[in-house]
Regions:
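Gram-negative bacterial Sec-dependent N-terminal signal peptides
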Residues: 1-24
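Extended, charged catalytic domains and RNA/DNA-binding interfaces, predominantly
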Residues: 26-394
Length: 394
């Protein structure tokens, strides 16, 4: 047996030697390789698949949609972590969660956008601290006592506070709105945290916020991401949805973004998400605010500001729906299709094609034929939309 194995090995050595000699013979008479004699060699296919590549191939992992206790809804349900905590966790540090647990990622993220809601940003930290001006309002004082009692009483307070804000019964004299001391402080906290933890080449801490349009309960939310540092981001406070200082119309958000760029020379983009909760108005062919057909200007403007779409996150997957893709066995993945965001209106089948990314791409091609521009040409990403201050998806 050993003799047979040795014989086989010997044949392998002989075959290798012959191949090498043939390769050498093939180059006999050719000049020594140098830059000046490159043309003297026979043209041949690159032996390296990486030769000639001049595009980026690195993949970076992160989250472009995270809420902390600065967000009105996150704070109402007990989130105590703030932007500094969020960036520390994303960079791989161990932090204490709002429930008192020690938490740490198995591997640090490469980037993070803390995207707290622009409406009423920073209100809850002030409530938790017992801001005397806020507690002078009887309703707010009652909420403060309920929150401090804890348990189901605190949960009831959270629901009551959110409903009051959405239904217009919130004591707005206590609200945190652009121009108020509370709001300015909250925005400065967000900017300072991003500046502190941004480390070029190691970790990117993006400045951002979420513009939370929810007219009639229909979701048109966008995460606004700055491509700038704190010096420019601090020039204008975030845009909100409450009139007269804000608006729920995406066109007005885009005007605000243009104003920011004109004023600062900076750059930004918006990332829409959760069309599945829009009840047919995320990717429409008519303006849901005017009921007029879109024109070329709309298509150009939307394409300019919204090159990405957040296709999946905690509130359901937004790529497609079983009724839109009946032959796709994965179309029912994480489907959330009962109604709009606050379930004030039920879902109808005819709404679906205007809610999901795949059908939106088809609609965009149709609009391009009519308008000459495709408003729904976008890349797709996934984010968490976590409201705990912790970007925990891995």
């Amino acid at each position: 047996m050993n003799t047979k194995i040795r014989f086989i090995n010997l044949l392998g050595v002989i075959a290798t030697s012959i191949a090498m000699n043939l390769a050498v013979a093939d180059t006999v008479g050719l000049p020594a390789p140098d830059e000046n004699s490159a043309g003297a060699f026979k043209s041949q296919k690159h032996f390296s698949p990486y030769a000639g590549r001049n595009f980026a191939t690195d993949v970076y992992w992160g989250d472009t949609h995270l809420h902390t206790g600065m967000s009105f809804d996150a704070g109402s349900f007990g989130a105590r972590l703030l932007p500094r905590d969020a960036y520390r966790f994303a960079r791989g540090e161990e932090v204490t969660s709002s429930t008192g647990l020690q938490v740490k990622l198995s591997k640090p993220l490469d980037f993070l956008v803390v995207a707290d809601h622009s409406d009423n940003m920073g209100w809850f930290p002030e409530l938790f601290d017992g801001n005397p001006e806020m507690l002078a309002n009887p309703k707010v004082k009652r909420w403060y006592d309920m929150v401090n009692e804890g348990g189901q009483t605190a949960v009831a307070a959270a629901i009551e506070i959110i409903e009051a804000f959405s239904q217009g019964t919130f004591p707005m004299e206590t609200a945190s709105m652009p121009g108020t001391t509370t709001y300015s402080s909250a925005w400065k906290t967000a900017i300072d945290a991003a500046e502190e933890f941004n480390a070029p080449g190691v970790f990117t801490a993006f400045i951002g916020y979420e513009w939370t349009s929810n007219a009639g309960g229909d979701n048109l939310h966008r995460v606004v991401v700055y491509r700038d540092g704190g010096e420019k981001a601090s020039v204008m406070e975030p845009y909100t949805t409450l009139e007269p200082v804000g608006s729920p119309n995406p066109r007005d958000l885009w005007k605000w973004m243009q104003s920011y760029q004109d004023k600062t020379g900076g750059r930004m983009l918006a990332i829409a998400h959760n069309g599945n909760l829009s009840n047919g108005i995320m990717f429409p062919v008519r303006d849901s605010f005017t009921n007029k057909k879109f024109d070329r200007d709309y298509a150009v403007t939307r394409m300019k500001w919204e090159p990405l779409y957040e296709v999946t996150q905690i509130k359901g997957d937004g790529e497609t729906h079983p009724l839109l893709s009946p032959n796709d066995e994965f179309a029912d993945y994480e489907t959330w299709d009962q109604g709009n965001l606050d379930l004030s209106k039920p879902k109808k089948d005819e709404m679906l094609k205007y809610e999901y990314a795949r059908s939106a791409l088809q609609i965009g091609l149709q609009l391009e034929k009519e308008l000459g521009v495709n408003p729904y040409k976008f890349g797709m990403i996934g984010s968490t939309d976590s409201h705990t201050g912790l970007a925990t998806a891995e």
